[in-house]
């Protein structure tokens, strides 16, 4: 499977129209993405296309899915273009540097593909994780190693079972595809396609189960290490050292990247200086060739040559011109006019000497190191006229290069993290607490609760629908489960069942007690009225 949505066989831009082609702005072209995020975007693009094909491209749902896929493809194309341009510029810089150092050498090595780099990175991460786990096994006690092996065996058993199911589903899907290609009648062909869709859905469910299983395994490993570190000081020390080493490695990688950027800048500056020198040399050569043209005999030609020489010396030596003019004036006869003219010339020469720029005492280095502007995360401003800024100039408020915000892909959850954070913020603001922040563990717990609730309700309602022998899931199926088990009622829907209510007939003793209570109340009210009247008469 290729990670490029251009190879998917469907051109999503044709479905969305030509108006979306102008949606990519200059800010998006300056954005930077990692290869992992590009792969996630490509996977999202493929899933949207497959869903649109299954639903139908002409249906409104299919059109919405195709529109979303077209947006993702536009962003992906812009980012891939920027990446290709950067790679081309780097290759050009490398070739120019190699040619400047050794012009006879021709570069034959090709730039490695992004897929190869990603595979190498994945292999490195796997090797590092295996090394880390082996080193931890050496530190663990035999009892802890046994517990770890139990975890690993449970994971392997479930993993193998999922893989067997996956292979079985793949075989059935391949058989159905062959049968669909052989069939000519539309009726049985549609039935086979429906079966194929069911098998594909089962395959997706298996993938989700595997991701959950792997995540649970990773979390259980982390908790196991933490619990063991509480009782095992050697493991505690090893984990601390490993975290420190990881931080040092990250700092080294950052320093290496900065050094590489500085070297690239210096190389570019050297290339520019070489180009400027070459241009100056070419100009000098052209000027020398023009002066070495064979002279024509005659007084006019001699005069023209003398004028050219005088102009060249004047440009190279402005002070010499002043001295020659002074000597020529000294040779002439001294008069009042000549004296005033000489005074004016001396004043102008002194002014030019005063206002001339002096050479700096500190020499300016030819290679000036400048830092490249790093991409900045651009936050969306408030919905006001000026966007929450003092000036309405977007060129001054936006940074030079912007970074793409973290792109949240479909994580197979009912509720996304962004929606949950927005909900918590709104609840906190409504209650007057201000902005409230969720801990990572609490956030994952709430998302798991939402997933469990939705899966439980849907599973039970589907069973009720099957019990009614119907293929459609209706509101009454969900309502029955919610009312009986969760005491939740769906607004706008009422149950079809008729509930009988019993009328309660009180006994004679109960009625006598009620009558005595009411009579006591009446007597107490009369006594209070008589007391108030007697007080008024006394006053």
Swiss-Prot record:
Residues 1-28, 86-129, 274-332 are annotated as: Disordered. One of its GO terms (biological process) is regulation of transcription by RNA polymerase II. Signal peptide: none annotated. One of its GO terms (cellular component) is SLIK (SAGA-like) complex. InterPro entries: Histone-fold (IPR009072), TAF12 (IPR037794), TFIID_TAF12_dom (IPR003228). The keyword Transmembrane does not apply. Residues 7-27, 87-105, 274-283 have a biased composition (Low complexity). The keyword Coiled coil applies. Its main location: nucleus. The modification N-acetylserine is found at residue 2. GO terms for molecular function: chromatin binding; DNA binding; identical protein binding; molecular adaptor activity; protein heterodimerization activity; RNA polymerase II-specific DNA-binding transcription factor binding; TBP-class protein binding. Keywords: Acetylation, Coiled coil, Nucleus, Phosphoprotein, Transcription, Transcription regulation. Residues 284-294, 310-332 have a biased composition (Polar residues). The modification Phosphoserine is found at residues 129, 286. Residues 413-490 form the Histone-fold domain. Residues 153-202, 239-285 form a coiled coil. It is found in: Nucleus. Present with 930 (+/-45) molecules/cell in log phase SD medium. Component of the 1.8 MDa SAGA (Spt-Ada-Gcn5 acetyltransferase) complex, which is composed of 19 subunits TRA1, SPT7, TAF5, NGG1/ADA3, SGF73, SPT20/ADA5, SPT8, TAF12, TAF6, HFI1/ADA1, UBP8, GCN5, ADA2, SPT3, SGF29, TAF10, TAF9, SGF11 and SUS1. Belongs to the TAF12 family. Functions as a component of both the DNA-binding general transcription initiation factor complex TFIID and the transcription coactivator SAGA complex. Binding of TFIID to a promoter (with or without TATA element) is the initial step in pre-initiation complex (PIC) formation. This is SAGA complex/transcription factor TFIID complex subunit TAF12.
